[in-house]
Each structure stands twice: as C-alpha cells, then as structure tokens.
Amino acid sequence: MANKKRSASSSRWLQEHFSDKYVLQAQKKGLRSRAWFKLDEIQQSDKIFKPGMTVVDLGAAPGGWSQYAVSQISDNGRVIACDLLPMDPIVGVDFLQGDFRDELVLKTLLERVGDNKVQVVMSDMAPNMSGTPAVDIPRSMYLVELALDMCRDVLAPEGSFIVKVFQGEGFDEYLREIRSLFTNVKIRKPDASRARSREVYIVATGRKL
C-alpha cells in the first residue's frame, strides 16, 4: 500500500513538474533550472547582486542560481559553488563537487574562497525528503545552520545571505539567530516557489560587524 501511495505521489509530482510554467520557461530559455526565476525575483525586490562581487553558492546543482549570479556580477565577479551532485561547467563558476558536511570538502571550499571575504553567501540546499516532516525538518535545519556557519567564516561586513528554509520546528529560532547577525532580514516566497511547499527564502542584508 505504501508503495502504491508513493507511486501515485511521484506520478502527481512529475505531472505537476512538467506542466509548471517556470519549468517550461526554463527549458525555453536554456536555463539550468526553475530556481533561476526564484533568485531573479529576489534580485528584483532586494537588489543583492552587483558587478564585481564574489558569491558562494551552496547546494548549487544543477546550476540555476550560479547561472543567475554570473549574469549579474559580470566578468570581474566570481562564483564559488559546491554540491554533492555533479554540475556541468558554467563560465565564471568555480565548482567543487563534494559533501559540504565533510570537513575535507569544507576545507577545500574555504581554500578556494581564499583570504578575501565574499559579498554574498546563498544556499538552496535541501536534504533528500522522506515525506515525514518530523524527519525532514531537522535534516533541513542542520543544513541551513551549516550555511549560516559559512557566513560567519567568509561573509564580509555588510554582506548578504540568501537561504532556503522549510518552515517548521526550529524556524523561529533560526530566524532570530539571523536577525542577530544582519541589519535587515526579510522572508520571501517567490512566485516560482510552489504554493504547497513549506519552503521560504530568508534574505538577510547588512551583516553586522
């Protein structure tokens, strides 16, 4: 019975995915993923990216956010991206494949960032979802805490942080933590984010000294 339910749910997801207007637009424009549109909407409202910036992209594959960031920071900007999954090359993106939770991968990522601080850290990381919120939410919160730790390590004063978070247990506490570190914090639900999804995007600007 459980397999039948999972099969029906998977079929429903596939049908919804391939009829999604943002998926269709992404395919038409040759974009890596529909996530490109989420970041574009955030940029239109919050003006995060500027030419010459250095950006760290966590959970980058298949590359929608990296692709968008490169288009905004111009040739003298830089994107350093990391994901457990492989990602086809993008001009202007330094990609590291590996598990961000692994100490060796984190060390390599920090070496690629170098001594200079970055202007933006963004994370679209999400765990493999089981469909059980009691399992999925803690896994998700662990990843977003790691992303915030990256901000503490590499983000410049006045820098910005964009992170996907699934609403549930621990969300309010995480939001308070971000507010203690940044001057301006907003919660965004882009149109390209499916309405029934628990995901929201926290956009934090003005990292405090």
Swiss-Prot record:
Stored Gene3D superfamilies: Vaccinia Virus protein VP39
Pfam family, one: FtsJ
GO-annotated molecular function: rRNA (uridine-2'-O-)-methyltransferase activity
InterPro entries in alphabetical order: RNA_methyltr_RlmE (IPR050082), RNA_MeTrfase_FtsJ_dom (IPR002877), rRNA-MeTfrase_E (IPR015507), rRNA_MeTrfase_gammaproteobac (IPR004512), SAM-dependent_MTases_sf (IPR029063)
Entry EC no(s): 2.1.1.166
Function: Specifically methylates the uridine in position 2552 of 23S rRNA at the 2'-O position of the ribose in the fully assembled 50S ribosomal subunit.
UniProt-recorded name of the protein: Ribosomal RNA large subunit methyltransferase E
Gene giving rise to this polypeptide: rlmE
